[in-house]
Design a protein with these regions (language model features):
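Ferredoxin-type iron-sulfur electron-transfer modules and their immediate structural context
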Residues: 1-2
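Acidic, serine/proline-rich low-complexity intrinsically disordered regions
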Residues: 5-248
Length: 248
């Protein structure tokens, strides 16, 4: 990766968002240098597993080390849906599967899934690292912020700083789809959009009540970092917000 970009972001993040949690990033690889997640001893939800990464422990995941079938699918390691998925996401089947009731009917779920983007992982593993732990050989594809409202407001505004159209999307989906699948695929678009996420009610128990995610394709992230020192971040308006950011 571009070490100059890494160092520049760390310096500017401390200057304009001092105390806010550092983002994490992911990349795909066939190498096994980073320790692999053990689903037998870790939580089933990928968002729960990422707490370790946010605290500074890099983790590698593959098709056999993600406990949730949804996590495997949205990381690109499985193309299949779990049995009765359309009922699981909607009304359920008494005595068979409890429904999450996130969609009104099984029929609606089927139509939604027809339009849901397909995605196959380019390599055998996905590796998550906190931004400050990335090294020169890493090639991050997406940068993920776990952010409280004031920080989120800053990121959202910065993402739109050099855009004519809206720079941020908020697609319906699981917590893991909002930080992996959607922003990864956005990285292939021109221009790429940031993805606001963690609206998944099932994933929210694994983040603080005030936390949302803000996932940024690396090409977009590069531009955002370059724009920081000429944006609203240098104004007295932002200084008022910056001064009340509570350390994570």
């Amino acid at each position: 990766m571009n070490i100059a970009l890494k160092d520049m972001f760390l310096r500017l993040w401390k200057k304009y968002f001092d105390g806010a949690e550092l983002p994490i990033a992911f990349y795909y690889t066939n190498e096994e240098k980073v320790a692999e997640n053990d689903p037998a001893t870790s939580g089933r939800c990928l968002i729960e597993n990422l707490i370790k990464v946010r605290m500074g422990t890099p983790l590698r995941f593959g098709k056999n080390s993600i406990g949730c079938p949804g996590g495997r699918r949205y990381a690109g390691f499985s193309a299949t849906l779990s049995e009765n998925f359309e009922y699981f996401l909607s009304c359920g089947i008494p005595g068979v599967v409890e429904g999450e009731r996130y969609k009104k009917s099984p029929e609606l779920v089927r139509e939604v899934m027809k339009k849901f983007p397909e995605f196959e992982a380019p390599n055998n593993f996905i590796v998550f690292k906190r931004w400050d732990q990335l090294d020169e050989s890493d090639e991050p594809k997406v940068v993920i912020f776990f952010a409280k409202p004031d920080v989120l407001a800053g990121l959202f505004t910065l993402a739109n700083f050099d855009e004519i159209e809206e720079g941020v999307l908020a697609p319906f989906g699981s917590g893991c789809s909002s930080i992996i699948l959607h922003p990864y695929l956005e990285g292939e678009n021109n221009p790429p959009h940031c993805v606001l996420g963690m609206f998944d009610i099932s994933a929210r128990p694994y983040v603080h009540s005030e936390i949302q995610t803000f996932a940024v394709p690396i090409a977009k992230f590069d531009r955002m970092v370059e724009n920081m020192q000429e944006s609203f971040l240098i104004t007295s308006t932002w200084e008022k917000i910056r001064n009340r950011i509570i350390p994570s």
